[in-house]
C-alpha cells in the first residue's frame, strides 16, 4: 500500500507514534509519505519506501493567522495525485482530520476516492478539541472519517462522553520496538550521572503544566532524603524554569540534572532505576512504556490510559493525581533494596511486551485493508 501519514513533527507522543508507525510500515514493504510542516524529529533517514513532503504556507499580510489547514489539504491533494496514494492516515484531530476531510472532498470531485483513517491521541480530544470553538469541527471530522482509532480505552470513553460521535472507534494502543530498549548498551554511561551507590530517577516529557513537573521535584525531594539518588529530567517546555527554581529553593539543585530534548532517550533509560510520571492527564503514557521496555519501573498517577499501561504492584504503582506523599512512599518501596528493585524491573520489561511493534502494527494494517476494501466496493 501507499500510505500518507499526517502528523505533528515534534517530540510529543502523537508525532513520535505516527513516525514510528510509518517506519514500521515501510519495514513491512509499504510506501510511506509523511506530510507535515517539517521533517519529524524521529525520522532520521529517507529511502525508497519513506518520503517526506513539506507543507509550506505562503505569508499573506491579509491573514492575521496563516491558514495551515488549507495549505495541508492542498498538499494532500497534490501528493495523492502525484504518488497514487491509497490511504490517508491523519494523527491528531486538530487540524489534521479536518484538513484530510477537505482533501477527500476535493479529490472526490476529481474522481479519486481515498479513505481516511483518523487516530485520536489525547489532548486533541480532552483539552483542545473540547473547547467550544473547536468542538463542532472535531465532531464533524471524526464522524466523517472512514475509520477512527484511539490510543487507549480511556481516550475512547472520553471521546464518546465529550462528543456526539456516530462513528465506530477502534482502540489500537501505542507501541514501541521493545528490542530497541533491551540492554544494548554495556556501560550505559551511568558513572557520568551518578555515584555507584546512588539510584537514578528519570522524568521525560514536554514539561507542560499537564505533566506536573513540580510534583516530580517534590517527589524526588522526599525520596532523596531516604535513598541517595539523582534526578534526570529530559525535555524542554514552559515548566522547566519553575522546576529549576523549585529545586534551588529546596536545596537539591545539585542533585537534579536537566538534559533538554533528546532523540536517544533509550540511552538514558538504560541506566535509570525509576521513572516518574505524575501527570494531570495521559491518554496513554508512551514515555512510561519506553521506560518499562528498558526495565524501569513506573511511579505514575492513575489518570487516563496510564492504568492500561502501568500495572499496579507489578510494573510500578499508581496514585491519585497530586498525591505526592503516596508517590514518594511507593518510590521508596521500589528503591529500598536491590532484590525489590530487580523484581519490579523484570516485571516492567515483561509487561511492555504487550505493546510491541510486532503485535500492534498488524492491527493498523488490518484496518487499512478493511477501509480500502469498503471504499472500493461498488
Description of each model-found segment:
Residues 5-11, 23-68:
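N-terminal strand-loop element at the rim of the active site
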Residues 154, 175:
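Carbohydrate-associated surface elements
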Residues 182-195:
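A short helix/loop element that forms part of the nucleotide-sugar donor recognition site in Leloir-type
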Residues 194-211, 217-220:
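Conserved donor-binding/catalytic core segment of Leloir-type glycosyltransferases
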Residues 261, 280:
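Aromatic "clamp/platform" in nucleotide-sugar-dependent glycosyltransferases that forms part
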Residues 297-300, 310:
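Short hydrophobic beta-strand element within catalytic cores of glycosyltransferases
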Residues 312-313, 317-324, 333-338:
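Conserved acidic donor-binding segment of nucleotide-sugar-dependent glycosyltransferases
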Residues 326, 333, 340-354, 363-366:
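A short, well-ordered alpha-helix in the C-terminal region of glycosyltransferases
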Amino acid at each position: 500500500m501507499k500510505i500518507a501519514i499526517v502528523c505533528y513533527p515534534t517530540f510529543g507522543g502523537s508525532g513520535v507514534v505516527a513516525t514510528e508507525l510509518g517506519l514500521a510500515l515501510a519495514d513491512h514493504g509499504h510506501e510511506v509519505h509523511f506530510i507535515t510542516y517539517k521533517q519529524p524529529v524521529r525520522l532520521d533517514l529517507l529511502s525508497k519506501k519513506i518520503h517526506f513532503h513539506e507543507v509550506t504556507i505562503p505569508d499573506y499580510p491579509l491573514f492575521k493567522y496563516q491558514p495551515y489547514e488549507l495549505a495541508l489539504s492542498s498538499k494532500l491533494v497534490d501528493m495523492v495525485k502525484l504518488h497514487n496514494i491509497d490511504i490517508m492516515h491523519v494523527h491528531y484531530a486538530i487540524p489534521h482530520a479536518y484538513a484530510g476531510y477537505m482533501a477527500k472532498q476535493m479529490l472526490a470531485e476529481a474522481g479519486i476516492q481515498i479513505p481516511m483513517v483518523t487516530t485520536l491521541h489525547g489532548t486533541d480530544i480532552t483539552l483542545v478539541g473540547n473547547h467550544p470553538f473547536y468542538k463542532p469541527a472535531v465532531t464533524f471530522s471524526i464522524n466523517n472519517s472512514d475509520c477512527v482509532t484511539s490510543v487507549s480505552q480511556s481516550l475512547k470513553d472520553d471521546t464518546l462522553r465529550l462528543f456526539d460521535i456516530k462513528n465506530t472507534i477502534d482502540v489500537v494502543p501505542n507501541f514501541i520496538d521493545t528490542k530497541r530498549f533491551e540492554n544494548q548498551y554495556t556501560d550505559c554511561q551511568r558513572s557520568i550521572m551518578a555515584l555507584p551507590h546512588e539510584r537514578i530517577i528519570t522524568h521525560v516529557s514536554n514539561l507542560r503544566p499537564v505533566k506536573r513537573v513540580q510534583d516530580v521535584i517534590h517527589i524526588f525531594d522526599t525520596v532523596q532524603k531516604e535513598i541517595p539518588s539523582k534526578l534526570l529530567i529530559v525535555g524542554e517546555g514552559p515548566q522547566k524554569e519553575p522546576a529549576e527554581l523549585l529545586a534551588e529553593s529546596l536545596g537539591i539543585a545539585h542533585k537534579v540534572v536537566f538534559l533538554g530534548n533528546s532523540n536517544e532517550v533509550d540511552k538514558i533509560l538504560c541506566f535509570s532505576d525509576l521513572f516518574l510520571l505524575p501527570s494531570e492527564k495521559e491518554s496513554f503514557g508512551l514515555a512510561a512504556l519506553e521506560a518499562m521496555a528498558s526495565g524501569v519501573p513506573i511511579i505514575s498517577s492513575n489518570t487516563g490510559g496510564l492504568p492500561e499501561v502501568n500495572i499496579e504492584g507489578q510494573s510500578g504503582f499508581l496514585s491519585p493525581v497530586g498525591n505526592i506523599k503516596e508517590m514518594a512512599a511507593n518510590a521508596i518501596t521500589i528503591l529500598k533494596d536491590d532484590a525489590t528493585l530487580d523484581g519490579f524491573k523484570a516485571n516492567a520489561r515483561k509487561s511492555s511486551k504487550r505493546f510491541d511493534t510486532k503485535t500492534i502494527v498488524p492491527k493498523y494494517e488490518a484496518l487499512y485493508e478493511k477501509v480500502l476494501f469498503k471504499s472500493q466496493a461498488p
